[in-house]
């Protein structure tokens, strides 16, 4: 697969994630869009690591680190969303006024 194809796919994923994050009114959807953005970045890390220097695995290792951070972020984000849902009975971002009290 060519470098340009992977970069275009990564740009599409990143754009979809940014668009979804900006227009999302649901917290779960916002978390999913954030995961799309992180996966697009991981694709770039692995692609550039493979394309420019095949012997060193810096991009691959950093990508694994980002995946671990994304998994922790998803777990903590899901816990926060479920806690907000239990208290407010809604996961809509514009209805959540936790910081105004």
Curated annotation (Swiss-Prot):
Keywords associated with the record: Chloroplast, Membrane, NAD, NADP, Plastid, Plastoquinone, Quinone, Thylakoid, Translocase, Transmembrane, Transmembrane helix, Transport
The lineage's top-level taxon is: Eukaryota
Enzyme Commission identifier(s)? 7.1.1.-
One CC-aspect GO term: chloroplast thylakoid membrane
Catalytic activities: a plastoquinone + NADH + (n+1) H(+)(in) = a plastoquinol + NAD(+) + n H(+)(out); a plastoquinone + NADPH + (n+1) H(+)(in) = a plastoquinol + NADP(+) + n H(+)(out)
Q: Which GO terms describe its biological process?
A: ATP synthesis coupled electron transport; photosynthesis, light reaction
| Matching InterPro entries | NADH_UbQ_OxRdtase_chain4L/K, NUOK/Mnh_C1-like
GO: which molecular function terms? Answer: oxidoreductase activity, acting on NAD(P)H, quinone or similar compound as acceptor; quinone binding
Query: How does the protein's chain sit in the membrane according to the entry?
Result: Multi-pass membrane protein
State its location(s). Plastid, Chloroplast thylakoid membrane
Q: Which residues cross the membrane?
A: 2-22, 32-52, 61-81
Where along the sequence do coiled-coil regions lie? none
Name the family: Belongs to the complex I subunit 4L family.
Query: What quaternary structure, including any partners, is listed in this protein's UniProt entry?
Result: NDH is composed of at least 16 different subunits, 5 of which are encoded in the nucleus.
Main role? NDH shuttles electrons from NAD(P)H:plastoquinone, via FMN and iron-sulfur (Fe-S) centers, to quinones in the photosynthetic chain and possibly in a chloroplast respiratory chain. The immediate electron acceptor for the enzyme in this species is believed to be plastoquinone. Couples the redox reaction to proton translocation, and thus conserves the redox energy in a proton gradient.
Q: What is this protein called?
A: NAD(P)H-quinone oxidoreductase subunit 4L, chloroplastic
Per the UniProt entry, what species is this protein from, by scientific name? Answer: Carica papaya (Papaya)
